[in-house]
A protein has these predicted regions:
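Outer-membrane pore/translocation modules
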Residues: 92-200, 242-253, 320
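Outer membrane beta-barrel transmembrane domains
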Residues: 50-52, 98, 105-109, 198, ...
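Residue-level detector of the transmembrane beta-barrel scaffold of outer-membrane proteins
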Residues: 38-42, 82-84, 134-138, 179-185, ...
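Outer-membrane beta-barrel channels and translocator barrels
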Residues: 78-80, 90, 129-133, 173-178, ...
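Transmembrane beta-barrel architecture of outer-membrane proteins
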Residues: 36, 66-72, 117-121, 160-164, ...
Length: 320
């Protein structure tokens, strides 16, 4: 089914914005069949000029820029159960006159390019309903991969453990809207406490796509986040205070992101995609905009192993 790989553009959209604006995980209701895998690789550029304060005011603190190399692997353990792992590699640079200065650590906001792996994301999904409305609950964990700097205008991430649960929903909109589908995801994330402070979040993601042809699809994307607890910037963490040293980790980041994209199926196993997006409104965040391009390759590991050993593929049970 074409929708099974329709979430590729959204995967790159949210994986990247999560680094700069703490956006949610991608909405992927459809899973690969048993024994099949999909590998996604994307490149992304994000930039921002303004911080958005607790009351929505814009604060110009210099130019922030990120480049991401995003990799993601999903494997269908059964027709209804899949696992996913991914990690981004981040290049970033801050150009401005207001660098963050960590206590006892080198300054990251020095006008130079810095790079690091960000966080591992490990996820398990189970397709509980497979009728006209697909429902896929999931559990995920985020683990920092290294000791990267988190106090920076262009930090790679928040360097926190996170545990999330939720459900993805998907439905074809035929016959009302032929060749059109919709996906949505609702999730709740528990983040590692800092200074004993809770700062959990709810996310809602929506994707609506339409196939112009069997190979070409266009889509609109939306992502909302509401953080419960945390710091109002700069009220609760003024410059020079102890709280300022962890204000990026504890920011009460709430935002709405809007995007649009197009994808092209080169063949039955290879997709290309491109997406543009922008933070439309936010509190305690950055006014990020960006563009991403990516490719997804679907394959069967078992068949690849058999080919390497010179064995013929096993016939399908449905084969004549």
């Amino acid at each position: 089914m074409r929708e099974k790989r329709s979430g590729t553009a959204f995967l790159f959209l949210v994986a990247g914005i999560e680094l700069a604006a703490a956006a949610p995980a991608s909405a992927q209701a459809w899973l690969p069949p048993k024994g099949e895998a999909s590998f996604s690789l994307g490149g992304q550029n994000l930039n921002a000029r303004y911080h958005l304060l607790w009351d929505g005011r814009r604060d110009d603190r210099g130019k922030m820029e990120w480049y991401h190399a995003i990799s993601d692997l999903t494997y269908g353990v059964t027709d209804r159960f899949a696992v996913r792992v991914g990690i981004p590699y981040v290049f970033s640079r801050y150009a401005g006159n207001f660098p963050h200065r960590p206590v006892g650590r080198p300054v990251h906001d020095d006008g130079q390019w810095h790079s690091t792996f960000q966080d591992f994301r490990i996820e398990a999904r189970y397709m509980a309903a497979t009728g006209s409305l697909v429902a896929t609950p999931f559990l995920s964990i985020v683990l920092p991969s290294s000791g990267y700097e988190f106090l920076s205008h262009v930090a790679a991430g928040r360097h926190l453990r996170e545990y999330a649960g939720g459900v993805s929903l998907g439905r074809r909109l035929d016959p009302v809207l032929p060749d059109t589908y919709a996906q949505a995801q609702l999730s709740f994330t528990m983040a590692q406490r800092v200074l004993g402070i809770w700062h959990n979040k709810n996310n809602a993601d929506v994707e609506v796509g339409h196939f112009l042809s069997p190979s070409v699809a266009v889509r609109m994307l939306g992502a909302w986040q509401w953080t419960h607890g945390g710091f109002r910037i700069p009220l609760d963490a003024p410059a020079g205070s102890a709280n300022f040293q962890v204000h990026d980790q504890l920011a009460k980041d709430s935002h709405f992101i809007l995007g649009g994209g197009v994808s092209y199926a080169v063949n039955g196993s290879l997709d290309l995609s491109a997406t543009v997006f922008k933070v439309m409104t936010a509190r305690n965040s950055n006014e990020v905009r960006g563009i991403s391009v990516g490719t997804t390759w679907g394959f069967s590991p078992a068949q690849m192993i058999r080919r390497r050993k010179g064995a013929a593929p096993t016939a399908s049970p449905d084969a004549p």
